[in-house]
């Protein structure tokens, strides 16, 4: 199947529309909210478009830290404001039903918002066999490594978890596990061994397209 991986949107309606026009399963890695230069209604339209596509089984959606910022105070981050809060609140039922903490396309292919770094993989003895069960167990509890916020991003942990890991300062790839994620802005899709950071829509209008 062809997959279109779409990086952090932050209110860019035109990028959502461009992605949805492509053939293949679209996977959005989160962060639709909290642009500093886009109006609230652009963010609302972004959510409405991806929610509709998800209901039609044309797309899948992963939580970003900027969505969780409005749902879990632990994840509160820059850009938070009351207009965006209302946008999320009005769609909370759909968001909680459709958004995922992560997606394993295969046991060896993980898609998340910010990536799973090798430090967490090693520390908690994760394997390809136990990865999905462990992540499902971690998701409801904000004190688990999935929700860690690293020192580099202003948190109390040595590295960030799947919503906060910084590509430049904290991420190390895991042998045998291909990963796609966003969160750390840069120019173009960046690759480190078998991992890809796709948060590039501020600088380069690129999606990552793969046959899996």
Regions found by a protein language model. Give the residues of each.
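Conserved beta-strand scaffold positions in the cores of enzyme catalytic domains, especially
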Residues: 3-5, 26, 61, 179, ...
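Core catalytic region of metal-dependent phosphoesterases/phosphodiesterases
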Residues: 6, 11-91
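Short loop/helix-cap segments at secondary-structure boundaries that form the rim of catalytic
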Residues: 17-22, 173, 188-194
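Short catalytic/ligand-binding loop motif for oxyanion handling, primarily in non-cytosolic enzymes
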Residues: 35-36, 68-73, 112-114, 118-122, ...
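Active-site-proximal loop/helix segment associated with metal-binding centers of metalloenzymes
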Residues: 82-87, 101, 106-172
